[in-house]
């Protein structure tokens, strides 16, 4: 059987009138919808049952046939087929138009596809379609040519006749005038009377002459128009057209409206046109060539595919199924209807009126007006508001047309296809669940009962608590006691998914094993809050239930929170102790001098004290109150491994479990080390947050995930336990103001006064004064901070919280207790009056007021940032969604070089960015040390141990595989991508690395600052664009705001300065032509860089520059870098620049994520010369396609195409994707669909988005083909294990029960009759 959901590609094209009639189940003839009295659809109307199917299941309109047994019968009275009512969602109708109309998408879109095809300007096209001008559709050249002389002779005769008539009339008039004058003379009339008569006569003669001349001109115009008449010629003058029609009607044909367009398309020779355009492109130049290129794109589209251009002119309009444009009755007897019904009604009304007018034989002008109105109503139906004023409904609201139903966030694509609501889900407020294990969550009983309802009902029936499903449902709804036991059983081992919006990265949805809890709030494990970015101030989370066995397996294996400890962005653990836990562990591992029971060496009069033979003994002493947790003691340890240096010294053969050694430490640290996995070296340090992070990091590298999960859980429990016992609380009494604050401020006040005096005397200008004041008050704030620091005791709770790294920083403490210091105004400049009060003392009114500026700007910024960052993520996901790991190894030899360390003198300095560049990559070549020994071989994964080995061998840089050089056609290969950051192993085939990359870059986007910073100072430096705007600028490949020129060649520079500009000339090393950079603004300052001698200084006259080097401060234009240095360099440049922005904010993202996006930006090639290939010059194609086609042509002995790589911004790259579904659901929906339909585009369904839209499994992860034929089948053992009797062997009454076999209890075979 053919499965409707099983297809490999989806094609879109133009529908012809025949297609529309084939889809249709009948013609809609009347504009009526529903009879308001009977509420039944009108016959032949927009909701007609005969066309679209019955409104009730198995029931015809007149009620003759009811019930399912008449299935498929067509009622002879009302003509309705007896079938299911849901066919009203799929059956279409159509409207037969009395006159053809054009499709607005192809006429009005930019560029106008109809205009390009017919070579007509859009303005002219509009005149023709809307009946403002006639167009010539055909001319019989041969007949005209043959009979031209005859016609010319006729024309000459006609002209002669007019001239003769004119002469005769003039002659007669002249004679009459003469006679009149004679008569007047005889009568002796006055001279002015005579003059009047003469003037009148002459005027009349002039009029005669003019009239004749006009007629002659008219004839000339008609003749010249006729001799030059050509198809596609516009005639705006109606009278001229009428004359031509009357005189020479048999030599040409012309018309107006869509009919004429239809005729033009029918007679259009596509192949001939394509050939002539190709010819123009080969030999033409300038504008002509460009226009030919653009036209060829449209013409070639119709030439190569099965599309007929006739589809752009419609003879029939499809009517979509009525259930998709419903009409519902409101209370009060009124109806609410979809806008489409109104638009359809207008079309039907005008069409019917037009038919009637044509039948009546109405005058042409009236018919044309009606045709124009029909055209406009069809335009409004397809895309309301695209041309002219939109059609409005009640309350002047534009009606939503078919195009509007697809567009935008509320359109079909984004609202219903990409984001659906799902069943088996719920949401509630979250509270903390400190007693949970990392893989558990607390689910409220009532919510669990509702979610697991079907499972509970089935199990109730299985266990014979209920006879049938109906009674089971009643039991569940009444919450009978048995239900809760069954719920416990059903819920065990069935993971649920928790999600917190906004889901910025994949850790925003994780799986947990539910534990039933009282109350109505979901309990969340404290360690996963970081990943969800959740806190407990009223956040809500949604719960989803994976139903099928496969879904549960995926949830458990791939999504369980204990398997997602590492961040996919940086590969470092996210499930770290934070806040209270950090404070607790910090308190536990602190060492306090002179605390109770501390170690004292032996003296004359007393033996040594504070020495313990085992941790147990020390704990006993603590319980008795003889020893403090934080006192320094000596203790003999046998179960904990000594630190590396002690192990090397004491146990040369290596330490084994049980070997004793003595540690000088505190009891707290011993307790802490007992939480770590066995065999982990003893950590004898105070546990600052950074140290804790380093330990967990190390665990993640060395131990399996399960061990790490257990360890962080233990750390969490210990952290909370000791945080409670530490008694760290914050009260007003803990905020201490340093006593010397006043004295410090007075000193600086005096300095500020002296600056103010100098300013008033005119020694300083305003800028200098402000700068000096800012400097003074910054120093003052700094000094108050230092005084504060020295004044605070070590055990102050606020200091403990800050020093342990739990939360907050010293600046906040200074604001609370010292002074707030300088604040900024809305422009981002410092206000030179500081806020001298601390929050503890309280601010004055003025201070409060100037502080509000900065605070409000912060809030506004955050709101804007969130939206911007979300949009950036959306574009990134869209551009990279089809990057999936498709194979294990593409076997390329290429790679990129990364730096591991720098040689400074004789020692190696480890590169600080090694974590995000070399870490987790695969080596492309063997790493060889100075003696030629292979340290790490090719294809090896660079983890921390491998990197340490390379550094120990003195290797400074290595060549690694990268997605930038991957040779896989679609997607990337696992070796080039390297290790998956989230699992710490080589990435799996099917992993959607593109989306992971987009999320990793987008998720920290909110932390990036919005502001473009100003460099302080008099020099008036240009803005430094930083933060989110800079990241967008890079990914969109825009020309940067402060663009810096780069050296086109390597050579020496000559620098000339004028008062406003620099002029830089580069004299190339190879003796080529000099390159001149003129008019470089001096505001942009020269670049500081390392010169050949190793010094860092400004660029000066006579310096040597390398190709691609920046000459001024600012950012290089990536398009320039591509032009000068090629694709590889521009990729590295973009990665580096994006990383700079993120590193400035302290965000750690691995380079490989940025590389994935950059790879997508450089996927395409512009064809310069098509050679023997099918490509059109000037068009964009995928690099892979380009290379394949060239190989094929070369193999056949043809000329390959020439192309150059282009850098596209992410928005443009998303819209240029091969998949029209993905592009249409991204932006500019109508434009993308118009283009796809004309080109008859086919979507191969390779990305994720396309498959989500049509409801198939996505081709990533377990949805990839190689995993699709795996089925889950429960085995007998698994069934047995599911419901075993709990074993009682180790209890007191084991003999009575016998051995538990673990076999399933065959409950189905028991007879329960006697129990009832």
From Swiss-Prot:
Alphabetical keyword list:
DNA-directed RNA polymerase, Magnesium, Metal-binding, Nucleotidyltransferase, Transcription, Transferase, Zinc
Keyword tRNA processing belongs to the record: no
A GO cellular component annotated for this chain's UniProt record is:
DNA-directed RNA polymerase complex
The residues that hold Zn(2+) 2 are: 890, 966, 973, 976
Q: Where does Mg(2+) bind?
A: 535, 537, 539
Record-linked InterPro entries: DNA-dir_RpoC_beta_prime, DNA-dir_RpoC_beta_prime_bact, RNA_pol_asu, RNA_pol_N, RNA_pol_Rpb1_1, RNA_pol_Rpb1_3, RNA_pol_Rpb1_3_sf, RNA_pol_Rpb1_4
What Gene Ontology molecular function terms does this protein carry? DNA binding; DNA-directed RNA polymerase activity; magnesium ion binding; zinc ion binding
The GO biological-process annotations, alphabetized, read as: DNA-templated transcription
Region of interest: Disordered = 183-209
| Reaction(s) catalysed (UniProt annotation) | RNA(n) + a ribonucleoside 5'-triphosphate = RNA(n+1) + diphosphate
EC number(s) given by UniProt: 2.7.7.6
**SUPFAM superfamilies associated with the record:** beta and beta-prime subunits of DNA dependent RNA-polymerase
The cofactor required is: Mg(2+); Zn(2+)
Cofactor binding note from Swiss-Prot or TrEMBL: Binds 1 Mg(2+) ion per subunit. Binds 2 Zn(2+) ions per subunit.
Ranges that cross the membrane = none
Matches recorded under Pfam families: RNA_pol_Rpb1_1, RNA_pol_Rpb1_2, RNA_pol_Rpb1_3, RNA_pol_Rpb1_4, RNA_pol_Rpb1_5
The record, for CDD domains, names: RNAP_beta'_C, RNAP_beta'_N
Task: List positions binding Zn(2+) 1.
Answer: 60, 62, 75, 78
Q: Which family does it belong to?
A: Belongs to the RNA polymerase beta' chain family.
Give the PANTHER family listed for this entry. Answer: DNA-DIRECTED RNA POLYMERASE, DNA-DIRECTED RNA POLYMERASE SUBUNIT BETA
Function noted in UniProt: DNA-dependent RNA polymerase catalyzes the transcription of DNA into RNA using the four ribonucleoside triphosphates as substrates.
Give the multimer and partner information: The RNAP catalytic core consists of 2 alpha, 1 beta, 1 beta' and 1 omega subunit. When a sigma factor is associated with the core the holoenzyme is formed, which can initiate transcription.
Q: What is the protein named?
A: DNA-directed RNA polymerase subunit beta'
Q: Which organism is it from?
A: Mycolicibacterium gilvum (strain PYR-GCK) (Mycobacterium gilvum (strain PYR-GCK))
